């Protein structure tokens, strides 16, 4: 008995050790310790320039940030690049921001001001710009590169189209400007639907827009190399899957943990032999199922991996409080519709049926909000929340 228990303990310890080794990134970069903290939102909307301030902070005080540079790329309403913007970067220490060039050695914490400038005429046909900030760190580990990608909204929302009747309801996609990390999405929703709501209407908000506003993004260019496990397990998925790339699989491992991913693969492989599909995602969890790999989102976020939103229930409650209407966060695409979170008065099955045509769109529509107006009241629909003024 003692020998058997010892063998089981040894096997468990060995499995944990190998799981830890396999899950470790194969390359660790000291530059990843540097974080960019936004201090002010982008100002200057409606003019030919955008201005914002950030703080570059190194968690390791022995690292010095050097060689800060910026490269900007603008995108038109058709999501194609436009060479119409220039970026300038000014740096300083503490709260002091002199208008000066980048210094050779900046220290472990730096105040950064970024300005995008372009002709006003050029900005009218743009919807976003990406700003790639790159730097190097120098310390006990030598020189190492680092960087991050910022997305700047440029264009304004266009007028919404006419409602589309779908039998049980009419749906109205409501456009907004591009949602970017750090946005108050509930405030954007309230402003976009002002004057367009009636009692009994329901708002369906895209889960991708919520995830982006929460900065649930992984930019493969700036992340550590995927682990050995991610590179190996990604080969188990068809090429069209978001988990078929090492970075996509690494995102799944980071979200659910390697043991759960291995268990999901085991159950998924066995049940597929008897004709059951989708078991992997049921075991791995909904956060893994919602991962969108590079190329799966609206440009310029098509260069990033978009993870599942973190606070969907709290978000729909906030939208309901601000707008006095029912709300839901939904994942809608050509494969189907799934409601992730909804206020108590939402008839989930009915809402999923109304959104089957994917009125949010999967292209460059910039319509993260869909207003659903029922043709007939639902017998299960609870009384609309009375707290907060109607939008």
Please identify what each model-predicted range represents.
Residues 2-391:
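N-terminal and secondary-structure boundary signal
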